[in-house]
């Protein structure tokens, strides 16, 4: 059942880790933000979990839900069935209705360090079989400002853009940065 220390070995853990669990449902509120989607969610809340003790609904980008959608969900949040848990993920908590936030436990996560993001990008590059220069990984990590999803999105775009190894020049071109070499040349020209 639910625990702070999952075993990662049982069938429930394995189905959650593989993204195949019928008891953990993620909804992207950025693209499913209306009342119809929330009504469908309310219907599925009625059903018991298939494998585990809880049915978990993760609503990502929760700040994107419409007011009508929140109003439709309010009653369910106020009196959720014992077998249901909601997780509202957002980067803009101030956009969530106060009536919702007041009924939730709030967990604030710190931004991921640039070093950790750069390491993860190198891991992804190794697993996917493409070359990523360390300085390019660091540049992406700094530009992502603590957001791993943003960093992975930039990396994905670099892969599509690069004809070989992903270098700092590829990253600079993609995100519109001026290279150090150009800045040095510019400052040198100003000085002379």
Where are these regions (language model features)?
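P-loop/Walker A NTP-binding region and its immediately flanking N-terminal helices
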Residues: 1-106, 124
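Extended, largely alpha-helical regulatory/partner-binding modules appended to the mid-to-C-terminal parts
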Residues: 8, 15-22, 40, 53, ...
């Amino acid at each position: 059942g639910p625990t702070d220390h999952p075993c990662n070995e049982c069938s429930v853990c394995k189905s959650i880790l593989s993204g195949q669990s019928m008891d953990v449902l993620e909804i992207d509120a950025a693209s499913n933000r209306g009342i119809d989607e929330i009504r469908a969610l309310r219907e599925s809340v009625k059903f018991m979990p298939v494998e585990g003790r809880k049915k978990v609904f993760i609503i990502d980008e929760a700040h994107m839900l419409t007011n009508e959608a929140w109003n439709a969900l309010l009653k369910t949040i106020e009196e959720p069935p014992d077998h249901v848990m909601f997780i509202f993920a957002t980067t803009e908590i101030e956009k969530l209705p106060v009536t919702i936030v007041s009924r939730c436990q709030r967990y604030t996560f710190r931004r991921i360090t640039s070093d950790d993001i750069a390491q993860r990008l190198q891991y992804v590059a190794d697993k996917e079989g493409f070359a990523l220069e360390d300085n390019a990984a660091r540049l992406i990590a700094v530009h992502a400002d603590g957001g791993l999803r943003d960093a992975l999105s930039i990396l994905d775009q670099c892969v599509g853009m690069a004809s070989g190894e992903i270098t700092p020049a590829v990253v600079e071109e993609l995100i519109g940065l001026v290279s150090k070499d150009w800045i040095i040349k510019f400052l040198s020209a100003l000085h002379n």
